[in-house]
A protein has these predicted regions:
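Phosphate-backbone binding interfaces of nucleic-acid-interacting proteins
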Residues: 1-120
């Protein structure tokens, strides 16, 4: 297991602020390379009642990004769309470890749940 220097706890936020974040389970159904991007890939995510394209900087974190196809993960789905490398991201993949400089892993439910299930 990798080791880290534990980061300081961020300033408190209210429960009301936290409840504004819409975190849902989705299944990664595919991915595309983004031309000219070293780390960024475009994920096609099934969120139950709709699909989203979500950009994630995970290309270099795995020997083969296709390893995550078919996996469920957590996504923030109420972020404003953001354009990167000419592509629009409609959310954010939750991962664990990137902010601490270790090899990131997906934040996943412990067993399969319906796509679109809310976290929190």
């Amino acid at each position: 297991m990798e080791t880290i220097d534990i980061a300081a706890v961020k300033p408190p936020i209210s429960l009301k602020e936290f409840q504004r974040i819409d975190i849902r389970v989705g299944t990664i159904e595919g991915y595309e390379d983004i031309k000219g991007a070293n780390r960024l890939i475009k994920l096609q995510v099934n969120l139950g009642d709709h699909q989203r394209n979500i950009l994630a900087g995970i290309k270099t974190e795995r020997a083969d990004p296709r390893d995550i196809i078919g996996r469920q993960a957590l996504f923030v789905i109420n972020l404003e769309p953001r354009t990167m490398m000419g592509e629009v991201s409609e959310g954010m993949l939750f991962d664990i470890g990137y902010a601490d400089g270790i090899t990131p892993v997906l934040a996943v439910p412990e067993k399969p749940v319906p796509n679109g299930t809310r976290a929190g």
